[in-house]
């Protein structure tokens, strides 16, 4: 595996070794010992998979502590523009984001530790997205940042995405920080 650090501490882009021949390909997407050698002592408890058509926007989701999730994400088929926003209030990179293209073709993976909002926009029809989570889903702790938050200035390369009706109460980053400070969750 080739691991690339990003401009945001703890956020990693991972390229697995892929073995291809006339039958197809094989690669190891997760190995506990390999990740331990990278300094990642992870305990995944839930795997999720979604299927989306082109132009679907999912995110920017997060779970509040103590249910904050780490996620190892990848695309099985199709492609996405994947984005992680640092919402760790004491982080020097608070409010900054990293974006990466994940696809079934490039097989790139993205490690997103707890304390990040995460989302993606699908770039192709029938995109299959997979994520391994370190903490189970907890409805009471879930939250979402507004994908078009003017503070973030994320260029999604799409003006009218297909959005979920599930998250009408998305927050602005500025309000999220105020809430964390008010609740002493910093």
Region roles according to the model:
Residues 102-124:
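Conserved metal-binding segment of the jelly-roll/cupin
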């Amino acid at each position: 595996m080739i691991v690339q650090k990003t401009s945001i501490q703890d956020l990693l882009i991972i390229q697995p070794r892929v073995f291809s021949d006339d039958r197809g390909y094989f690669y190891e997407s997760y190995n506990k010992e390999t990740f331990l050698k990278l300094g990642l002592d992870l305990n995944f408890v839930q795997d999720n998979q979604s299927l989306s058509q082109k132009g679907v926007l999912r995110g920017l989701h997060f779970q509040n502590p103590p249910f904050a999730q780490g996620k190892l994400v990848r695309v099985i088929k199709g492609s996405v523009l994947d984005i992680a926003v640092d919402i760790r209030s004491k982080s020097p990179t608070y409010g900054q984001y990293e974006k990466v293209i994940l696809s079934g073709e490039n097989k790139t993976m993205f490690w997103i530790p707890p304390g990040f909002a995460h989302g993606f926009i699908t770039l192709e029809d029938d995109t299959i997205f997979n994520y391994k989570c370190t903490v189970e889903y907890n409805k009471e702790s879930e939250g979402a940042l507004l994908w078009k938050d003017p503070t973030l200035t994320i260029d999604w390369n799409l003006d009218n995405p297909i959005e979920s009706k599930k998250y009408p109460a998305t927050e602005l980053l500025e309000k999220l920080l105020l809430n964390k400070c008010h609740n002493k969750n910093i």
